[in-house]
């Protein structure tokens, strides 16, 4: 058995079921974290602006406009144990794989809805 096959077998065990989403979609990511001795879940809702990597190491970047109009971006590993669940709020229709141009856009961003 080659090392590549061994890595694939181990990755298959780690992969959990997540909904299908693409850049342009608005998602709500529920993140679990420890605060002292208790665990809390916090939701982070925003537009997926990029997805990169493959397999177990796949990551996605979510951007939202926070308080005072300041943009906040978070990069999440797709199969991380800290992610409780991912909800697709809205499906967006875009023609790019990376939506980094949204960083310069001020105000509300218009993304057409995919059916």
Swiss-Prot record:
A GO CC term assigned to this protein in UniProt: cytosolic large ribosomal subunit
Top-rank taxon, per record: Bacteria
Keywords: Ribonucleoprotein, Ribosomal protein
One Pfam family per UniProt: Ribosomal_L19
Family, as annotated: Belongs to the bacterial ribosomal protein bL19 family.
Biological process terms in GO annotation: translation
An example molecular function term from Gene Ontology annotations: structural constituent of ribosome
SUPFAM superfamilies membership: Translation proteins SH3-like domain
Protein name, UniProt field: Large ribosomal subunit protein bL19
Record function comment: This protein is located at the 30S-50S ribosomal subunit interface and may play a role in the structure and function of the aminoacyl-tRNA binding site.
InterPro entries: Ribosomal_bL19 (IPR001857), Ribosomal_bL19_CS (IPR018257), Ribosomal_bL19_sf (IPR038657), Translation_prot_SH3-like_sf (IPR008991)
């Amino acid at each position: 058995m080659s090392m590549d096959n061994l890595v694939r077998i181990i990755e298959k065990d780690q992969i959990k079921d997540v909904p299908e989403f693409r850049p342009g979609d608005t998602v709500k990511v529920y993140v679990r974290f420890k605060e002292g001795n208790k665990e809390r879940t916090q939701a982070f809702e925003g537009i997926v602006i990029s997805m990169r990597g493959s397999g177990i190491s796949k990551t996605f970047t979510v951007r939202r406009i926070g308080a005072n109009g300041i943009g906040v971006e978070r990069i999440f590993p797709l199969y991380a144990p800290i992610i409780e669940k991912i909800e697709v709020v809205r499906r967006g229709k875009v023609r790019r794989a990376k939506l980094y141009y949204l960083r310069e856009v001020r105000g509300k961003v218009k993304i057409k809805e995919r059916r």
